[in-house]
């Protein structure tokens, strides 16, 4: 056989065989481990189904953060609300924070359940043009803990992408867990088949957050995920009465803008700290429509406009 090395033991099955490195003839061969582990995995039949399912989704945006507690899910929700403010847009949100799903709460969808239709799982709709899917809809109680290892998380993410009927969505916004984990690798692996616009990375001004964001950006570069830009959340506190600005989290090393310059990625803007944002999320409401005159609302709208312009430009280039 042409695929049997010259120095191979007798009865070698060959390097291209399914039995390569696994039969008794392979015992003692110095190449046994290489042969046993180097067989390429068969193509995943679900990748084609995912590509077909998402072919009707124009733009796909991942929202990332290096650390928890920086307002990533809050930003995801208000990015979606801001996009859906245009009634001609269809917007979808996918929550892949499997172990800590907060998206149902910030959209006011706690207690909702997933429904099956002839074309797959149906998202839960906040508005006629804003649908949401989350593992939170699959839990019996909001307090139930999800204790899953990587393969099971991977399977659910695949099922969300393959089986949910997203329809003709203009934007799919994906809320991810903090850091870089199995969920990130899975979603990028699957979405790579479907032309992802890129990632928005959310941080706070202090160095302890920026340190992890640098790693997040490096991760994006390694997996060839474009970085749409960095958002500095909770940049300053603006007093709702006197409008005076105060730094709650001082940018000891120059903040997110300086870090973005160093990492050679775009800086999208700063969102000031407003306690009413937290209240709106707890109540499942859109802060942008509830408090339209807040400086934070203006910041959100400016950032969302930049993201839309980026996505439109990337669509024309592809």
From Swiss-Prot:
SUPFAM superfamilies for this protein: P-loop containing nucleoside triphosphate hydrolases
Cofactor(s) the record lists: [4Fe-4S] cluster
Cofactor mode of binding and number, as noted: Binds 4 [4Fe-4S] clusters per heterotetramer. Contains two stable clusters in the N-termini of NUBP1 and two labile, bridging clusters between subunits of the NUBP1-NUBP2 heterotetramer.
Entry-linked InterPro entries: Mrp/NBP35_ATP-bd, NUBP1/Nbp35, P-loop_NTPase, YlxH/NBP35
Sequence segments annotated as region (Disordered): 1-24
Keyword terms of this UniProt record: 4Fe-4S, ATP-binding, Cytoplasm, Iron, Iron-sulfur, Metal-binding, Nucleotide-binding
Chain sites annotated for binding [4Fe-4S] cluster 1: 12, 26, 29, 35
Binding site for [4Fe-4S] cluster 2: 239, 242
Location of the protein in the cell: Cytoplasm
GO cellular component: cytosol
Family matches, as Gene3D superfamilies: P-loop containing nucleotide triphosphate hydrolases
Positions of ATP binding: 66-73
Residue ranges, compositional bias (Basic and acidic residues): 1-10
Function field: Component of the cytosolic iron-sulfur (Fe/S) protein assembly (CIA) machinery. Required for maturation of extramitochondrial Fe-S proteins. The NUBP1-NUBP2 heterotetramer forms a Fe-S scaffold complex, mediating the de novo assembly of an Fe-S cluster and its transfer to target apoproteins.
Assembly behavior: Heterotetramer of 2 NUBP1 and 2 NUBP2 chains.
Name of the protein in its database record: Cytosolic Fe-S cluster assembly factor NUBP1 homolog
Species for this entry: Nematostella vectensis (Starlet sea anemone)
